[in-house]
């Protein structure tokens, strides 16, 4: 994770971009790709970080989620006259201002894989909405393999599979501070913890 910040200082032409929202230089992991050159530089940066660290640097899922959400929220707003895109841009701008790390929480624990989320015996095997009010939505459930979230400032939660109409409470994408009340992390030893470098 630290190397993603260091590379932005050592090689700004590779690991930074200009924010269209703040006008300032930002970490490329927070940048929304605007053209094929941006995509090329994202890939080149990831390759460089892989060479420098020899491991996961824990920011790719968050970057990919932001790029997807930029398009999807716009398309949803166009179709349904909602304001998800404006809300997303406000959040993205805050992330740009403070150079924060976004983790992506996509993988659900799934339970019985032959069943959709609403068909599971245990409702908490997938993340779902349990309450809504003027402040937002409240979620409950589980995600798996979220090592990067432990080292992030925020996590973007999203479904991992196609959902049916009966799964609408599970159709949630949102950002949660990683230290929010009620979140429990279970972290185990990794298979490569003792490997020689």
Description of each model-found segment:
Residues 2-102, 148, 154:
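Internal helix-loop-helix
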Residues 99-112:
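A short, Trp-centered hydrophobic/proline-enriched beta-strand micro-motif
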Residues 109-197:
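FAD-binding core of flavoproteins
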